[in-house]
Curated annotation (Swiss-Prot):
It is an enzyme of class 2 (transferase). It catalyses: oxaloacetate + acetyl-CoA + H2O = citrate + CoA + H(+). It comes from Thunnus obesus (Bigeye tuna). Oxaloacetate binds at R359, R431, R451. Its EC number is 2.3.3.1. Pathway: Carbohydrate metabolism; tricarboxylic acid cycle; isocitrate from oxaloacetate: step 1/2. GO terms for biological process: carbohydrate metabolic process; citrate metabolic process; tricarboxylic acid cycle. GO terms for cellular component: mitochondrial matrix. Keywords: Mitochondrion, Transferase, Transit peptide, Tricarboxylic acid cycle. This is Citrate synthase, mitochondrial.
């Protein structure tokens, strides 16, 4: 059994008497090196062999049925992708390589004096399936700092965008322009053997993740801070700390929030628009810059990455209409009136989840610790108490519980980041951790070009024996 397989057993052992022994053994499995690429080079052949054997034995096994509703319904619930880095359970929420968010908060290394996990540690976990040591996380921080500088043509491009161009459009365009630096594109054009693809995708992915905070911070400064300088990367600081410094925020609590935000938004299984897009475009052997840029164009859509902005707009309108503190009864009436008018309560419900999103829960815990008396947080907390019961009474919602978007905007606002148009860029910086970790594995495992079969309505009707008319 490969280490990746064994590591997925860790959550089941966390509460057992063997938990401490197991976690020490897991860390020691590759703790002798701090170089992530070396660890990957050891893991990949074992995983290739494991999957080859699995396919030989079970390749023709049926794993589910496809209905007409699934085909018309955005392929919802259809099992059609292999995505290794995270799995979304309807009852538990997201698990990163088998670890829940609370487990990641407990196990992943933190900054000195910090309480939230470092995104570098999560990236190591997503790539390897292993909980990293502090030394390994520190290596990633320094590696990203070393790779962070932007080429001059990208800086010039960002400085010349019109101010009315949406931050996500700027973000995507700048990422596409980084394609000039692609190691993978260059190696492919020179005829590199396909068994080496993953090495160059890894290099591009590390470079891209390193540069994203610089791109995002430059967009923020150009649009909202009169084009002031983002400053220089400090190789002694972690990825999130450098990011908040470049954005112009010096408060330690905001940096802690950013570490949490970038960790919990990083990955959410493979079927969501941004993850699936990067997987699809990458399957054409487009380099990581092109693949991730395409993913960001999907994330920019209002049904994917703009939800936290919509929540904040709705909360602000609610607060303005209702005034100061509102009784639970009045709030309940307001929610009912919202639903009866044909509108929805933004931030509630999820395509897969059937319980409160654990990403919401950890943000709520952060707020309870750091901003318990903030009026907007108190409003969010009041809604959490009322909305699910109203939605259950209405009887239409499959999931009446809050999702991640119900909370994140309120936290950012509290620390002074009020520019709602920018929030999806933060989401994009975070999402790189998950989709690029998977992209490396997709090339390592030799996943082919994605090419599902499409059908016309007439063809579907013929297939199921329905009469057209």
């Amino acid at each position: 059994m490969s280490f990746l397989s064994v590591s997925r057993l860790a959550p089941k052992l966390l509460n057992s008497k063997n938990a401490t022994y197991f976690l020490v053994a897991a860390r020691n499995a590759s703790a002798s090196t701090t170089n992530l690429k070396d660890v990957l080079a050891d893991l990949i052949p074992k995983e290739q062999s494991r999957i080859k054997n699995f396919k030989q034995q079970y390749g023709k096994t049926n794993i589910g049925q496809i209905t007409v509703d699934m085909v018309y319904g955005g392929m919802r619930g259809m099992k059609g992708l292999v995505y290794e880095t995270s799995v979304l359970d309807p009852e538990e929420g997201i698990r990163f390589r088998g670890y829940s968010i609370p487990e990641c908060q407990k196990l992943l290394p933190k900054a000195p004096g910090g309480e939230e996990p470092l995104p570098e540690g999560l990236f190591w976990l997503l790539v390897t399936g292993q909980v990293p040591t502090e030394e390994q996380v520190n290596w990633v921080s320094k590696e990203w700092a070393k790779r962070a500088a932007l080429p001059s043509h990208v800086v010039t491009m960002l400085d010349n965008f019109p101010t009315n161009l949406h931050p996500m459009s700027q973000f995507s365009a700048a990422i596409t322009a980084l394609n000039s630096e692609s190691s993978f594109a260059r190696a492919y054009s020179e005829g590199v053997h396909k068994t080496k693809y993953w090495e160059f995708v890894y290099e591009d992915s590390m470079d891209l993740i390193a540069k994203l905070p610089c791109i995002a911070a430059k967009i923020y400064r150009n649009l909202y801070r009169e084009g002031s300088s983002i400053g220089a990367i400090d190789s002694n600081l972690d990825w999130s700390h450098n990011f908040t410094n470049m954005l112009g925020y010096s408060e330690a609590q905001f940096t802690e929030l950013m570490r949490l935000y970038l960790t919990i938004h990083s990955d959410h299984e493979g079927g969501n628009v941004s993850a699936h897009t990067s997987h699809l475009v990458g399957s054409a052997l487009s380099d990581p810059y092109l693949s991730f840029s395409a993913a960001m164009n999907g994330l920019a859509g209002p049904l994917h990455g703009l939800a936290n902005q919509e929540v904040l707009v709705w909360l602000t309108a609610l607060q303005k209409e209702m005034g100061g503190e509102v009784s639970d009864e009045r709030m309940r009436d307001y929610i009912w009136n919202t639903l009866k008018s044909g509108r929805v309560v933004p931030g509630y419900g999820h395509a897969v989840l059937r319980k409160t999103d654990p990403r919401y829960t950890c943000q709520r815990e952060f707020a309870l610790k750091h901003l318990p008396n903030d009026p907007m947080f108190k409003l969010v907390a009041q809604l959490y108490k009322i909305v699910p019961n109203v939605l259950l009474e209405q009887g239409k919602a499959k999931n009446p519980w809050p999702n991640v978007d119900a909370h994140s905007g309120v936290l950012l606002q509290y620390y002074g980041m009020t520019e709602m148009n920018y929030y999806t860029v933060l989401f994009g910086v975070s999402r790189a951790l998950g989709v690029l970790a998977q992209l490396v594995w997709s090339r390592a495992l030799g996943f082919p070009l994605e090419r599902p079969k499409s059908m016309s309505t007439e063809g579907l009707m013929t297939l199921v024996g329905a009469k057209s008319g």
